Amino acid sequence: MTTKAFKYKKQAIKDQQPSMNVPGVAAWLGDTFISADADKRICAGFFRLEKGNKLVYDYDYEEMKCVVDGTFIISDETGQKVTATVGDVLYFPSGSRITFETADYAVGFFCGQRVPL
């Protein structure tokens, strides 16, 4: 068995993330790390949303998100709605349509099973 070294990125939360390029929505998303296994790809990084228009996102992959700063208001098409604060963890199944909003700003760390950005 070949030993592989782990990866480390100091203060990754401070990296400037690329815009999601959704007109009228102040949202940024970037992959910090991408796994090497192409068959079971995992991408992890940060998502930032600022006050303004809501972001509606259709998931075609599984994702977990942990709120690391600020407060998200998150809802789905089933009528479920939560106010997620620092330390809260969310799971978005493939096929879900999620609406993200915030009264000020929020940052989440995500880990998703999808193709890299």
Residue ranges and their predicted role:
Residues L55-Y59, D76, V82-T83, E101-T102:
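Short histidine-centered beta-strand/loop micro-motifs
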Residues A5, A44-F46, M64, V89:
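Conserved hydrophobic/aromatic beta-strand scaffold that supports enzyme active sites
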Residues S94-L117:
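Ligand-binding loop in jelly-roll beta-barrel domains
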Residues G30-F33, C43-Y59, P93-S94:
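Conserved short histidine dyad/triad with adjacent acidic residue
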Residues T78-S94:
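Short acidic-glycine-tyrosine-enriched beta hairpin
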